[in-house]
Amino acid sequence: MEEKNIHMQPNINYSYRNPNMYNMNYHNPIVPPPQQQMQLFVNDWKSILSPMQTCKIKQQFDDREFVADYFMGFKLDFNNKYLILDASTELMKFTACEKSEFCYRNCLPKICIPMNMKILSYGKEISKPDILMEKDCTCTFLCFNRPTIKMYDFSNNNNKELIGTIKTPYRCCSYNFNLFDPSNNKIMYMDDTCCQMSILCPCPWGPFKYSNFFLRDANSKEKIAHLRKEVPFLKFVKRDIDNYTLDFEQVQNPEWKMMLLAFALFLDYMYYDRK
């Protein structure tokens, strides 16, 4: 019998341990107390992310870099922090906190630096993140030894469960990212030109303000998600600060929505967070 290779699709909600959260037709014969239901809903990052159609990613301003740059003349780079908001309500849902060594950040090229980033739902402790993103230290040159981001679900008693990986093949005049599931099947990709006006000459007005990147399904090649980069007015004060709007469009699976969030953070880290 011929064995079928089934790939996880980003526009499908798959069954989880609590199927009643994602399937309105499912009836659970055992109903927990209301307190337990509320706690389960609040603490589960999938149930928070699942109904979101569009989110905003805002990089927080670090006044230490501003003081070091404009008053001391030093180009210092500190760990980034991002706020992730539901675009429809402007309410903060997640925060993303980067952790990398100070010497690595200020002495090595960004593409080579080992990186650790935690994504946690609003109100959670930094020691108990929902998602963990990891990038190893690599000696990267052009197409050799390209970096890979691994994303883990860390919400199950701090046990790491691989959700997917993000790889960035070398391209001369374009941004290329490939998103893979835990079985290393390519699910989505982005391949867009870097010759956009807002990239070549970033300014907070007119056609110089926005850059557009589109995620495509690996099989159909159709556009399934849209990432828009915005240049804020703080660009004049801190040159590497940017904001993003991520429209999930056809992506319904909360795990792949989180993968798209990780992709947006990785894109900013790799190409726009400059020393």
Curated annotation (Swiss-Prot):
Enzymatic reactions: a 1,2-diacyl-sn-glycero-3-phosphoethanolamine(in) = a 1,2-diacyl-sn-glycero-3-phosphoethanolamine(out)
UniProt cofactor(s): Ca(2+); Mg(2+)
Superkingdom of origin: Eukaryota
Annotated Gene Ontology cellular component terms: plasma membrane
Cell compartments where the protein resides: Membrane; Cell membrane
Any GO MF annotation of the entry: calcium ion binding
UniProt cross-references to InterPro entries, sorted A to Z: Scramblase
GO biological process, one term: adhesion of symbiont to host cell
Keyword line: Calcium, Cell membrane, Lipid transport, Magnesium, Membrane, Metal-binding, Transmembrane, Transmembrane helix, Transport
Transmembrane segments: 256-272
Record note on disruption phenotype: No defect in asexual blood stage growth.
Similarity comment: family membership: Belongs to the phospholipid scramblase family.
Role description: Catalyzes calcium-induced ATP-independent rapid bidirectional and non-specific movement of phospholipids (lipid scrambling or lipid flip-flop) between the inner and outer leaflet of the plasma membrane resulting in collapse of the phospholipid asymmetry. Preferentially, mediates calcium-dependent phosphatidylethanolamine externalization. During the liver stage, plays a role in the interaction with, and thus invasion of, host hepatocytes. Dispensable for host erythrocyte invasion and asexual parasite development.
Assembly notes: Forms homooligomers in the presence of calcium.
The name this protein goes by in its record: Phospholipid scramblase
Upper lineage: Eukaryota, Sar, Alveolata, Apicomplexa, Aconoidasida
